[in-house]
Amino acid sequence: MDSKDFTQLNLEEHSYKVNREKLPIDSYIQYGGFTYANFTPYIIHGDDGFGEHKQLNWTNKLLWNKLGKLNIKDTQILMQNNISEEQHNELISLEAQKIARENLADRINYLQNINTSIDFKLWKMNKENLERQELLLRQINELKEEIKSLKNIPSTVAIIPTNTYTINMIRTETEDWKYFKYIEKELVQNKTEAIAKILDNSYIINDNLGLLYERYEEINPTPKPYKRPETIFDTPQYAKYIRNQKRQEEYEKQQELKKENENKEYQEFLEWKEKQQKDKGKGIQTVYPTLIIPDIKPEKQKKEDMMLEMIKNLQNELEQLKIQRHKEHEKQAELTKIQMLEEELEEELDPDNLEKEVLNNIQNIQISSDISESSEINEISDNETEQISGSDSDYNNEQINVKIEGEEYEYKDNYRYYKPQPPYYKKDIRRERQYKGQSSQRADYIKNRREQFESTYQANMNTTINDSGEILNLDCTTPEEAEDRIQKWTQSMSIALVKQQLSNEQAKQFIRRTFIGNVKEWYKNLTNEAKQKLEGNAPLLSLTHMELGLRAEFGKLGIESDVEKHEKKTSIARHKILQLQICSMDHQNLNAYLCEFQEYYYSANYTEAESENILNMFYSKLPEPWGQQVLNGYLSEIKGKNLLDSIGARMTYLQEFISDKCKENWTQKQARKIQLSKNLDCSYYEVGKYGCKQIRPHKRKRYYKKYIPIKRKYFNKKRYKKYYRPKKFLKRKNPHKACKCYNCGEEGHISPNCKKPKKKTRINNLEALEFKNTEMENLEFETNKNDIIWVEEIEVIQPLHYEEEEKYKGNYSDRILQNPYYINSISIEELDNLDWEFEYQEDIEDDLEYQNFVYQESNDNWYSDQENWYSDEQYLGIYMFIGETSGENNQDNMEGIIKEYNKTEPEKINKIIFTSEKFKQIMENDLNMTKDKIFHNNKLKKLFGKKEIEYYIVTDIEHPIDVKYVQNQDKIINLPLYNQEIFENEIQKIPDKDQNKIRNIHLAAVEIVVKAYFREGIDTPFEIILCDDRITYPQEGSLVEVLIGNLIYQKVKFTKIINYSISIEDKNLDKSLVMYWNLEGIKMIKDSKIFSIRLRNLYVLSNKHIVKNKKQYNGNIIIEPIFQDVIQNNNRNYIEYGKPGKFDRTKLKSYSRRFNEPLRLDDRTNIQREKDQIEKADHNLELQKELNNLNYYSQQGQSSNVLDIPKILKIENTKNNYKQFHIIGKITEGRLNKFYPILIDTGAADSYISSKILEDEKLVSNKLSKVVTSYNADNEKHIYDRNTEVIIELIDKNNEKYKINFIGLVDQLRLLEGGKAEILLGMNILQNLKPYCITDDYLEINLGFRCIKINRIKKDIFEIREDLQQMNVLNE
């Protein structure tokens, strides 16, 4: 934008108070700290990249303020230490008033930044002018150097006259000095004449060079270097060639060092600035001297010297700009009174809109008299006329003009209708359809049918507001319409009062004269006290009181407040946006959908977290397959590149997407047959082809005529039948159609003719619908007095006790039927040898069912109605015991874990080691609950199945838990596992015909995975309690499940069978199943995430209440064998588990202590019983090995329910163990030029560099008061500064290199693995790279506004080290 256009820009609409430290990185156009670019009033975005940050570019703000916003008087006031109120009022510029309240240091810094930009521009131009002048002088200096070279010759040989551009001819040595002739000085007009003169004399010099050469040989007979024989010096042509080469080399060097010299250039500018300030303080004025070449007559104005003219033009232009800005400041001083009125209107009106009206429409206002002369509208009493006549002298013969606009405010006494109109008199399509009936004619019928599917939304586009006042008529209006009219009347009157500059008394009369009809009668009937309350001390205050009185009388102010009105509007908008649907992609329907969605979105007032889900819903509501395609395309193509995710961007992408699809289909030959365009209105986006497309009229479909008419006859006594046209007979191979009976499944008859007993319908809808809704939600909830759960110390779980051996004599099936727990003590092969029979007995009186096991050969799975269900990958039977333990190290041996305790402190753990296979199984295990897994056997189908409507829903959701909800809790926090909002969303997805029929929700099962946000191997016992908080008495009835466990694996998983129903109208639905927890053994810093809870809920939406066999399935829980070592359910009965009267947070016992207890007598009996069973199968070698293991553990005194492993001596031999996230970085600072592995940890770990890197390379760091202590492998202590700077070079997927300066990587941390050359980046570094994203394949970080993806190294840490050693060797 040119400088002349500054007057047309309203800076107040764009400028905001900007903190310079919070500006984004690329706010400066070219240089960091200064710029001389052109003015570009564009809005830029903030540092996060999301959300609209209305910050004016700092560069533009500096240029604007320098060129016109601050004058000399304002600058002098701002430079004072203390600014008084009088001086503050004298400030003319609004920008000066904003910064007048700041500190002196901030004001001076602000003024310096303003002067820096324009001064740098002048300095830059002066510097370029000097450079060009130097280029002109450089050629002359080269000529001088040639002349000086001749001066070095002895005087006896050659004589060179001084101060001349011509050279004498060299004479012989015998000639006297007095006979030498000197060429007279010639005045050279310009540079070209001087060069031509020298070239002419060069030939004379070359003729005498021979003499010089001979003389040189006589004086100096020593051998000389190789030179051309005819001359000592080069010819002028050769000298010119050398000069050109030097210039070319200098130009290339300047281009190469241009980028490196940008910061140097800024330093030169600062030095020049300081020098200018010093000279200015001493009273010295810098004068640029004119350029005078010796023996050359300078001209007054040269065409070649463009830089001098440019400087003069710029100086003149700046002077004109300053004069122009000074005039604008004088005009702005005249508008200070109007700005005072703006401050009064801040609470009543929108300041931005009012500013436009005031600044653009202030003119010499002459008030005409239209209302005062109309006696029909203004019927004023005698007292009022006297007051008005008395105040007419103050008006200076000016009159008030009230403008009446719009038919809705038109008032006529002769045509007043008090009878309300029917509700469908307005032209609204949604209301109008209810009164449309089908026409008898087919054309009208088709037209009406088409209108039913047209757009049903019309936006209110009438947004005009009068600036001259309006008549207020509230006759025959509803409270809603009265609110709208009063609001519009208030806005129009406020602008009119400010524009006409009326006094308080004149404003009161002006307001009263706008009342007509019922409003006028209401105001007349008011008492004097009531009228005084409606009046104020200022015109706008009186208008505000009058607005409140009108709203209380005619509107809804007495019924609901503004806050309640806003909340109601928000809730209605949120409810409507969920019900919004679009079924046809016609352009009219699409435009209506966009308009209505936009209105509800802005009225609902969503937060930033909710906004993204709602914006995704904008695409998901489109008909399939367009909704998912558009959403995926937007997320992949636009969202990563666009700086602002808004409705406008999504609307634009949707229109472009439809346009592109229609263009693709148009190029194909059979566009109408393609499935991709069947629901799109491509004619709206196509290029017009008028008259080319044939419009076919509607035709009925022709059907096959079965009968033909007979011939006409004049007279026929008998009425014969019509002629019959038989169809062709097709002979079939099997004339009888094969039918199959639904009851018995046999062919040959149908179910009504079946003779077998009728089959009862158990489940109406076996094909259940699954909706997966994966969302990330932050845990934000509060509790009240009722949301309390008591936790008491729970005894350590002991192995199952079995009855004596005599009770189980007989075959295995009898034993299992008598004791279901006996199945855990036999092997799998013995289970295969059993003769299983399906037995089902039902006692009608007791309503009990015996427990039976069913074996299905087709799927090879075991199922039990009350016990756990496992897939074929899981196993039942005896645990395999391997390895050996060492009592000297005092180790606890768990399944896959070895703990090494300290010798001096037995409770302190020194090292914890895992097996890679065990940990790999844990990490790969995830949520896998499905409806088929829960509702697999017939008994469960009978339990949960219903004849009526049933929809089986599976939802998936994850909650990250903050550390403040675990450590130092003032309140007991719970997590609702079910949410009413989730239920409502799933009900919206089922067919419309069944949505209104859903009345109950049957909670079938919930699968829970708890994942830690810290590394594995930390002994962290925890307790989980599932409760139904709706039950207050009895207390034990609220307990659903109690579990104790340990997060030593980083993950635990279990499934709970809930099996009870709730009503969809229950207001306490969120309390139907909640989770409480207690975790110990670890402490983390504030604002850290300690673990996450992922839920997969299975529930049934039904129209009836499901209550069958509830007692049989109460308390069922599924814990897979891989997690049975780290989590167990409490063996207490729920009736015996009582809550104490007062909540006491007791310390949970460490889960590892149960492994230290000695073997009890019951456990030894169980081992002996298992030995007897294994001895019966001598032919099985594997069982014999298990027998040996049992003998070994019986001697050691260990429990048979504990799985031990041998001690792992070398964990480094473990392969394919890349569970951690590693990338490769190269440290390039100083002597550090090596590749190192970088571990990414998003948990609570701090960032650090291993002591090996710091010790070997000795990084240079800043000295601070706080230091950091680190230990290496030899337990040597090293101290480093806390703010050590390290430059790490990262390589993205496209092999582009990025150098990042990381500060503060070294933290106080004892490196247990000592000496390992590794770098760890924790949350304190990753938070500075927001937004960042970690996937299985790459790490995505944000540098400025650029997204960088870095590949993950999917190798073991030991393999990575070997590869890096080779890379470092090649690098060296």
From Swiss-Prot:
Give Gene Ontology CC terms.
Answer: viral capsid
Which segments does the entry list as coiled coil? 126-153, 299-350, 1162-1189
Q: Which GO terms describe its molecular function?
A: nucleic acid binding; zinc ion binding
Q: Does the keyword Coiled coil apply?
A: yes
- For the keyword Metal-binding, the answer is yes
- What Pfam family is a match, any one? MP
Highest taxon in the source lineage: Viruses
Q: Where is this region: Disordered?
A: 372-398
Which of UniProt's keywords are assigned here? Answer: Capsid protein, Coiled coil, Metal-binding, Virion, Zinc, Zinc-finger
What ranges of residues constitute the CCHC-type zinc fingers? 739-756
Biased composition regions of type Polar residues, renumbered to the chain: 386-398
Q: Which PANTHER family match?
A: CELL-TO-CELL MOVEMENT PROTEIN (PTHR47599:SF3)
Q: What is this protein called?
A: Putative Polyprotein CP
Q: Species name for this entry?
A: Cassava vein mosaic virus
